[in-house]
Swiss-Prot record:
GO CC list: cytoplasm
A GO term, aspect molecular function: NADP binding
Record-given protein name: Gamma-glutamyl phosphate reductase
CDD domains to which the protein is assigned, alphabetical: ALDH_F18-19_ProA-GPR (cd07079)
UniProt source species: Anoxybacillus flavithermus (strain DSM 21510 / WK1)
Entry's family note: Belongs to the gamma-glutamyl phosphate reductase family.
PANTHER family cross-referenced by the UniProt entry: DELTA-1-PYRROLINE-5-CARBOXYLATE SYNTHASE (PTHR11063:SF8), GLUTAMATE SEMIALDEHYDE DEHYDROGENASE (PTHR11063)
Catalysis performed (reactions): L-glutamate 5-semialdehyde + phosphate + NADP(+) = L-glutamyl 5-phosphate + NADPH + H(+)
PROSITE patterns in alphabetical order: PROA
Keywords assigned by UniProt, alphabetized: Amino-acid biosynthesis, Cytoplasm, NADP, Oxidoreductase, Proline biosynthesis
Chief location category: cytoplasm
C-alpha cells in the first residue's frame, strides 16, 4: 500500500475523531503547537538550511529562496499566527440560520468541518503550519503536499507539531505530510475522492492549473496575483508614491504585491514616482511614451502586462480615463487585488462597481490582502474564484453546513 493511501486512511479516521472535540480541546492542542515551534526553532532552522543550500545549488530564483527561507523571526511569526488562531472564535457548531415551517418542523443550519483537506503548495514552509492550525481549529484533518524544495523544512515542522499533539486530545494522525513529492503521486492525490473532501492549491499558475485540470475532488482555487494600482488624476502625491513603494517593495515575492501601476496622464507627479522607484532599485517596464521620455525606463513587451513578476520589477501604463484603466485590468488582471488612488468619489464608485476582483482598495496598499491583516488569523489561501469562498480564506472558508430538522411525527403528504 502506497504512502498516499496509508496516510489518507489515517486522516479519514482522525477526521471523525477530530470533529467531536470541543473548542477548548482544540485550542489547548494549538497552544502546545505554538510553544513547540518556539522551543524547536533551532532544529527547524537547521533543517531549513538544508533546503536553502539545495535550492541555491539548483538555481532557485531569489523570490523562491525568499519564500523558502525561515529565520528566527519568521518562526516566531508562524507561532504567533497559531496563537492568533487559538484566540479566534470557533465557527464549528454555530447556528447560521433557524426557522420553523408551517407544519411545525424546526430547521437549523449549523457549521461543520469539511472532513479531510488536501493542501498542495510550493516553497513556503509557513503554509505547512498555517494550514494545519486552521484545519485543526475547524475540526478538519489535513494532508499536506509541499514541494520537494522544502521537504526538510516541512518534515521538521510536521514532526514538531505531531510531537506536540501527543500531549493533546487531537490524534497525531490528523496532520500528515506527503513525503513523496513525485508528479505521479500528486496526480493520484488529486483523484482520491474516497478520502479527501477538498483540495486547496497554493502556488504559481502552473501548480494551480495542474490541480484544477486534473482533480476529481472539489477545488478551492487560489489564484496568482497580477495586481494593479490605478493612480487617478486627483491622487495625492505623497500618498500615491508611498502606496506604490509599499505594494511593490515591502515583499515583492508575494501574491498581493503590485505588478502594474496604471497612471492617469493628467496626474502631475509621474516623474517623481518613476524617479523614486528607480532610485529604490525597481526595474521599470512602461509603454513607449514613458520609455522614450526616461532613459532608465524600458519599453514594456506585451507579456509584461500579464506577468506576475514576484520581483522588484514594475510595469507602468499611462491612460487617459478611468474607463481605460478598468479595461486594462479586465484584460490582464487575475481577479486578486486591485487598487485605486483617487480623491474623486465618482471614479472610486465606478472602479468598485466595475472591477471584478476578490478585493478592491481605495487609497490603500494591495499588501493588506491577507488573512491576518483582515482579522481572520492565519489564512489557508486567497481565493480568486467565486464559489464557496473568495478573497483571504480564514476559518469559515474551510467549513460546510449541515441542516438539522426537528420534528414531532410529521410525514410528507
Amino acid at each position: 500500500m502506497s504512502e498516499l493511501i496509508v496516510k489518507a486512511k489515517k486522516l479519514k479516521q482522525a477526521a471523525s475523531q477530530l470533529a467531536m472535540l470541543s473548542t477548548e480541546e482544540k485550542n489547548n492542542a494549538l497552544a502546545m503547537i505554538a510553544e513547540a515551534l518556539i522551543a524547536q526553532t533551532g532544529y527547524i532552522l537547521q533543517e531549513n538550511e538544508k533546503d536553502m543550500e539545495i535550492g541555491k545549488e539548483n538555481g532557485l530564483s531569489p523570490s523562491l529562496l525568499d519564500r523558502l527561507q525561515l529565520t528566527e523571526e519568521r518562526v516566531q511569526q508562524i507561532a504567533d499566527g497559531v496563537r492568533q488562531v487559538v484566540d479566534l472564535p470557533d465557527p464549528i457548531g454555530e447556528t447560521i440560520e433557524q426557522w420553523t415551517r408551517p407544519n411545525g418542523l424546526i430547521l437549523k443550519q449549523i457549521r461543520v468541518p469539511l472532513g479531510v483537506v488536501g493542501m498542495v503548495y510550493e516553497a513556503r514552509p509557513n503554509v505547512t503550519v498555517d494550514a494545519a492550525s486552521l484545519c485543526l481549529k475547524t475540526g478538519n484533518a489535513v494532508l499536506l503536499r509541499g514541494s520537494s524544495s522544502a521537504i526538510h523544512s516541512n518534515k521538521a515542522l510536521i514532526s514538531v507539531m505531531q510531537q506536540a499533539l501527543k500531549q493533546s486530545k487531537i490524534p497525531t494522525d490528523a496532520i500528515q505530510l506527503l513525503e513523496d513529492t513525485s508528479r505521479e503521486t500528486a496526480q493520484q492525490m488529486f483523484r482520491l475522492k474516497e478520502y479527501i473532501d477538498v483540495l486547496i492549491p497554493r502556488g504559481g499558475a502552473g501548480l494551480i492549473q495542474s490541480v484544477v485540470e486534473n482533480a476529481t475532488i472539489p477545488v478551492l482555487e487560489t489564484g496568482v496575483g497580477n495586481c494593479h494600482i490605478f493612480i487617478d488624476d486627483s491622487a495625492q502625491k505623497e500618498m500615491a508614491i508611498d502606496i506604490v513603494i509599499n505594494a511593490k517593495l515591502q515583499r515583492p515575492s508575494v501574491c498581493n504585491a503590485v505588478e502594474t501601476v496604471i497612471v492617469h496622464k493628467q496626474w502631475p507627479y509621474i516623474k517623481e514616482l518613476l524617479e523614486t522607484l528607480h532610485e529604490k532599485g525597481v526595474e521599470l517596464r512602461a509603454d513607449k511614451q514613458l520609455a522614450d521620455t526616461y532613459p532608465f525606463v524600458h519599453e514594456a513587451k506585451e507579456e509584461d502586462w500579464a506577468t506576475e513578476f514576484l520581483a522588484p520589477i514594475l510595469a507602468v501604463k499611462l491612460v487617459e480615463t478611468v474607463d481605460e484603466a478598468i479595461e486594462h485590468i479586465e484584460r490582464y488582471g487575475t481577479k486578486h487585488s486591485e487598487a485605486i488612488i483617487s480623491e474623486c468619489n465618482e471614479h472610486v464608485e465606478q472602479f468598485f462597481a466595475r472591477v471584478d476582483a476578490a478585493v478592491l482598495y481605495h487609497n490603500a496598499s494591495t499588501r493588506f490582502t491577507d488573512g491576518e491583516q483582515f482579522g481572520y488569523g492565519a489564512e489557508i489561501g486567497i481565493s480568486t474564484q467565486k464559489l464557496h469562498a473568495r478573497g483571504p480564506m480564514g476559518l469559515r472558508a474551510i467549513t460546510t453546513t449541515k441542516t438539522l430538522v426537528y420534528g414531532s411525527g410529521q410525514v410528507r403528504k
